[in-house]
């Protein structure tokens, strides 16, 4: 009997669910194989270790985030880009939780893992530089305050993305609300 193939997106989706539910330390191929209804050896045909699979998953998500962020460069104002970027980051909010496991991964387990972790670090730095650049452009355009350092604004921006959506709002509505509070503040209209 031929081995069952695994669809890439199914493998990535189940990997994500297991990481979110069980954490990195409890993640293993047997559990993943059971969820995918395949033999463990089938997963080994694709990835030689959990480190390689998990970093491949992270690269896959980062590629999607980066592609969506790059598509926003066409927006006319830096403020609109910052708002739209927040929507992308909130849409993929699970990535922040999952990237917290990077220090647990043995980066020296294989050249592929080391390369993936290095790339993730570079991509994260690129996104941070993009946000910082947009902050500077928005200041120049008079869209945001220029009396606060961009590094502080960027930290507040990234912290706002991490606010848990306990009410389980649609990610678009949640992003809109968070950005509005971030941009307009908590003061009642006319009280600023």
Predicted regions: what they are:
Residues 91, 129, 133-141, 156-192:
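C-terminal peripheral helix-coil segments that are non-catalytic and often amphipathic
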Residues 37-47:
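Short hydrophobic/aromatic patch on the recognition helix
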Residues 54, 58, 62, 117-128:
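Amphipathic, non-transmembrane alpha-helical scaffold segments
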Residues 92-115:
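Amphipathic alpha-helical segments used for helix-helix packing
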Residues 26, 49-55, 64-65:
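Short amphipathic alpha-helical segment with a characteristic S/N-K-E followed by hydrophobic residues
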Residues 1-22, 26-35, 52:
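Basic, helix-initiating cap at the start of DNA-binding domains
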Residues 56, 70-95:
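Hydrophobic alpha-helical connector segments
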């Amino acid at each position: 009997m031929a081995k069952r193939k695994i669809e890439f997106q199914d493998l990535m989706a189940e990997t994500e669910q297991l990481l979110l539910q069980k954490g990195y330390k409890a993640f293993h191929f047997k559990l993943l194989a059971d969820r995918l209804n395949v033999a463990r050896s089938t997963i080994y045909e694709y990835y030689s270790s959990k480190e390689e699979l998990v970093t491949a998953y992270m690269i896959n998500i980062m590629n999607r985030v980066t592609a969506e962020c790059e598509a926003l460069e066409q927006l006319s104002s830096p403020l609109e880009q910052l708002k739209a970027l927040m929507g992308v980051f909130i849409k993929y909010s699970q990535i922040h939780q999952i990237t917290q496991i990077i220090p647990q991964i043995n980066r020296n387990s294989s050249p592929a893992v080391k390369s993936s972790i290095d790339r993730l670090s570079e991509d994260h730095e690129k996104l941070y530089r993009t946000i910082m650049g947009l902050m500077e452009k928005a200041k120049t355009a008079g869209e945001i305050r220029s009396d606060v350092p961009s590094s502080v604004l960027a930290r507040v921006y990234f912290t706002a993305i991490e606010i848990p959506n306990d009410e389980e709002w649609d990610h678009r509505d949640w992003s809109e609300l968070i950005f509005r509070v971030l941009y307009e503040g908590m003061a009642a209209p006319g009280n600023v």
